[in-house]
Structure formats: C-alpha cells, structure tokens
C-alpha cells in the first residue's frame, strides 16, 4: 500500500514538472521575445532570445516570435498636395526590417503582431514623410527635381523609422 502511494506521488510530481515546462522553436530570421506574465518583473525581458529552442514556464511566461528579415510592403495609394496646391498620387512600396536586437522594444511599445504595426503605425509614418516633404516644393520643383525630392522623402522616412527601431532598406514612391 505504501509503495502505491509513493508511486502515485512520483507520477503526480512527474506530470506537474512536465506541464510546467514549455518549448518554443524560434525560426531562423526571427527573434523570440520572452514575456513574464506575473511577478514584480512582469513584462518583456530586455534580452532577445536567439533562434532555435527556447524553454520556458508556460504558466508564468510567454514567447512571441518577431521576424527580423527584410519585408516588402506595398501600401495602398493616397494623394498629397504640393506647396502650390496641386495634387500628386503616391503608391509607395517599402522594404524594411526591425533593427537588430530591437524587437523587444518594438513589442514593448506596440504590443501587437508585427504585421499590424507595419500596416498601421508605420503606414502613418510613410504618409507623413511624403506630406511633410512634398509640402516644401511646388509642382514645377517636384517634377524638375524628382530625384532630389524622393531622396529627401527617403531620408525623412528613414530617420522616423529608425526612432521606432525599424531600418528602411528601400523606398519606391510611385509618385504620379
């Protein structure tokens, strides 16, 4: 009888210890972000987890996966007015990525999936960059110096995205 109780206790201990151990495989090209759900240090850990196997306690922690490779986004077209009031159509496509090691800061700030951040918040930065830069030039200046105008837009957007821990790789304006 005593041995049955000991066996039951051992089985219970084994089941509890196995259920308190979580495993997540973080793919190559992604960073795993470990979030503490409880306690005085709850929130996002400051350290990005490397790719590969990640062991964690599923009762007190959760692991999110953020892609860190270059992604190309084709935003919907919109219109912007130049300094003299003429209207230009913009159909932007950008290639960007999270700055290396910055995925915990991005997750901490937005608490959303990366696609939601790119299609929401970052789209606003794209529209602002075009609006701010095109409002500085007249129609003639934009048409005559398109390369210079697009470089100014790209520099403005790159600086704005860097503040949000994103790195702009390429911008195609689709300016018409």
Model-predicted regions and their roles:
Residues 10-14:
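Hydrophobic helical h-region of N-terminal Sec-dependent signal peptides
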Residues 1-8:
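Bacterial N-terminal signal peptides that target proteins for export
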Residues 17-20:
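C-terminal motif of bacterial Sec signal peptides marking the signal peptidase cleavage site
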Residues 89, 118-176:
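Amphipathic, coiled-coil-like alpha-helical scaffolding segments used for oligomerization/assembly
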Residues 22-129:
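Hydrophobic membrane-anchoring helix/hairpin
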């Amino acid at each position: 009888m005593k041995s049955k109780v000991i066996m039951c206790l051992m089985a219970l201990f084994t089941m509890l210890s196995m259920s308190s151990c979580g495993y997540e495989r973080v793919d190559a090209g992604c960073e795993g972000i470990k979030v503490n759900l409880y306690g005085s240090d709850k929130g996002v850990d400051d350290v990005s987890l490397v790719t590969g196997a990640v062991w964690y306690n599923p009762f007190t922690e959760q692991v999110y996966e953020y892609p860190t490779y270059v992604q190309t986004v084709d935003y919907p077209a919109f219109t912007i007015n130049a300094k003299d009031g003429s209207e230009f159509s913009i159909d932007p496509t950008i290639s960007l990525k999270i700055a290396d090691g910055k995925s915990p800061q991005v997750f901490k700030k937005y608490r959303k999936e990366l696609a939601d951040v790119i299609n929401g918040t970052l789209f606003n930065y794209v529209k602002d960059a075009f609006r701010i830069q095109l409002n500085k030039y007249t129609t003639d200046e934009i048409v005559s110096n398109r390369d210079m105008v697009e470089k100014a837009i790209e520099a403005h957007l790159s600086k704005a995205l860097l503040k949000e821990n994103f790195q702009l790789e390429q911008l195609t304006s689709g300016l018409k």
